[in-house]
């Protein structure tokens, strides 16, 4: 275990210990816990803990708040891997979270799932932007992913979760996958939004149904929870392609669902929407 300081913030880093010879092959594990604080008018890093295959990078500070870039040094996830991320946007701060690259869910062994667990809290008067790049599902993958966001009543939150079904450039189709995906948003301790998906088997056949995805190769969910959400509905609808829709599920919560033929088409359609909902800014990682 090592303790260092970064920009005045204490950082704890743990070294991974590999199993003894003859044990099962080591699986990738990673943990990142971070929190922000207010320093004058700026949002800055308060605490950071990182271990294993998870790392967190911090571009230069900006007037928009603190940006953090998550990195999986294992290059992807497969059966038996475990990644946990926790972040707290403290009162009055702005925190933007993204990933350095697309996450890849590789072919897994028959039994274990790859586990990804993300838990975010947004305190009073704070804003959190959860803007990971696409997760790409490979044929044979097994992924169990959970995202929980806890918000104070006057907090603001923007999230996007893009999902890509196979490697289109290689002609890959998802005929055998296992997927469990759950997104939960709590406001003042009460459930405000829940989206859950569970699938096992031939996903490609399911996606090809006209009433499901009509052969789409990628999809995304966007949620904007803010006192200004209602005023964003009409402008956002104007930006959407024919394969997307937006609605208010509460006066202060806007939900967008989007389908696209390819991951490139999905990102190209998402970018103007995210810019609109994020004060005309996006992390550099998102640039085409």
Where do the PLM segments sit?
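A short, polar/proline- and glycine-enriched secondary-structure boundary/capping micro-motif
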Residues: 54-58, 106-111, 140-142, 168-172, ...
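Internal, conserved structured core segments that host functional sites
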Residues: 111-173
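One face of beta-strands
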Residues: 32, 83, 116-118, 126, ...
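A short, structural micro-pattern
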Residues: 28, 50, 114, 141, ...
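A structural signal for small-residue-enriched, beta-sheet-centric alpha/beta enzyme cores
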Residues: 163-288
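N-terminal, charged/glycine-rich beta-strand/loop interface patches
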Residues: 2-134, 139, 275
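Structural motif
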Residues: 94-96, 127-129, 156-158, 220-221, ...
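Short, structured patches in soluble enzyme cores that scaffold and shape functional sites
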Residues: 89-91, 99-101, 122-124, 132-134, ...
């Amino acid at each position: 275990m090592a303790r260092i300081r970064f920009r005045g913030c204490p950082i704890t880093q743990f070294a991974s210990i590999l199993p003894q010879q003859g044990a099962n092959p080591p699986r990738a594990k990673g943990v990142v816990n971070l929190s922000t604080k207010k320093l004058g008018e700026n949002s800055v890093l308060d605490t950071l803990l990182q271990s294993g295959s998870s790392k967190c990078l911090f571009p230069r500070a900006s007037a928009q708040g603190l940006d953090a870039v998550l990195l999986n040094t294992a290059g992807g996830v497969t059966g038996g891997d475990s990644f946990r991320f926790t972040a707290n946007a403290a009162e009055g701060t702005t925190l933007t979270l993204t990933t350095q690259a697309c996450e890849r869910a590789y072919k897994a062994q028959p039994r274990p799932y790859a586990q990804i667990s993300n838990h975010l809290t947004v305190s009073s008067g704070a804003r959190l932007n959860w803007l990971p790049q696409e997760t790409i599902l490979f044929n044979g993958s097994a992924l169990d992913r959970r995202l929980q966001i806890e918000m104070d009543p006057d907090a603001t939150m923007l999230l996007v979760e893009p999902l890509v079904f196979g490697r289109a450039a290689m002609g890959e189709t998802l005929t055998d996958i296992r997927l469990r995906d759950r997104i939960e948003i709590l406001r003042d301790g009460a459930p405000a939004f829940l989206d859950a998906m569970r699938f096992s088997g031939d996903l490609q056949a399911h996606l090809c149904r006209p009433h499901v995805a009509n052969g789409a190769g990628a999809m995304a969910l966007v949620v904007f929870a803010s006192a200004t959400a209602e005023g964003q509905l009409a402008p956002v609808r104007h930006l959407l392609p024919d394969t997307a829709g937006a609605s208010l599920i509460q006066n202060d919560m806007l939900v967008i669902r989007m389908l696209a033929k390819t991951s490139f088409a999905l990102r190209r359609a998402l970018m103007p929407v995210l810019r609109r909902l994020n004060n005309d800014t996006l992390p550099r990682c998102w640039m085409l």
